[in-house]
Amino acid sequence: MAKLETLKAALEKVLGKRVQKLIEATGELTLIVKADDYLEVARTLRDDPSLRFEQLIDLCGVDYSDFGDGAWDGLRFAAVSHLLSVTHNWRLRLRVFAPDDDFPVVPSLIDVWNSVNWFEREAFDFYGIVFEGHPDLRRLLTDYGFVGHPFRKDFPVSGYVEMRYDPEQKRVIYQPVTIEPREITPRVIREENYGGTQH
């Protein structure tokens, strides 16, 4: 725990007012910054000798629209980076919220850590978060003509289109989803001696 306290003090000293929030939970530290400060903070985290986060291990998108059983009233989309300082043996989670829920845009970190390239593409593909300044921001895992962003909470579980092989056309075709939603009621069997106990 002393290591986390040392890191927390170093972050507060070096970043000052650019720290929007610093959360310590379950033995981990999360730094939240504003989108306007995101790129500058990332460079500082990498270059400052007292921090030296040389590696970005992962970046993912998050949709907070139903977070906390729908009680969330903050911004909807966030990009969350996981950083590693080999020099100091520290780990840090860096979170930035996109200021616009309708068109989420945050700066790209590709000029700071080039390992973020495909991680940002994945977050764009699945959540629709645009990383401004990314040299090749295109879909990574979904199909070329895919409509929407499948990890958003408002995306239908069954999707919008399905593909199947058409024997008449002898090729794979796309068509609107034909899955009919149905209600499944579980069958409950009651036993007199449930669990082997006598009443």
From Swiss-Prot:
It is found in: Cell inner membrane. GO terms for molecular function: NADH dehydrogenase (ubiquinone) activity; NADH:ubiquinone reductase (non-electrogenic) activity; quinone binding. GO terms for cellular component: plasma membrane. It catalyses: a quinone + NADH + 5 H(+)(in) = a quinol + NAD(+) + 4 H(+)(out). Pfam families: Complex1_30kDa. The keyword Cell membrane applies. Keywords: Cell inner membrane, Cell membrane, Membrane, NAD, Quinone, Translocase, Transport, Ubiquinone. It is a peripheral membrane protein. It comes from the Bacteria. The keyword Cell inner membrane applies. Belongs to the complex I 30 kDa subunit family. NDH-1 is composed of 14 different subunits. Subunits NuoB, C, D, E, F, and G constitute the peripheral sector of the complex. NDH-1 shuttles electrons from NADH, via FMN and iron-sulfur (Fe-S) centers, to quinones in the respiratory chain. The immediate electron acceptor for the enzyme in this species is believed to be ubiquinone. Couples the redox reaction to proton translocation (for every two electrons transferred, four hydrogen ions are translocated across the cytoplasmic membrane), and thus conserves the redox energy in a proton gradient. This is NADH-quinone oxidoreductase subunit C.
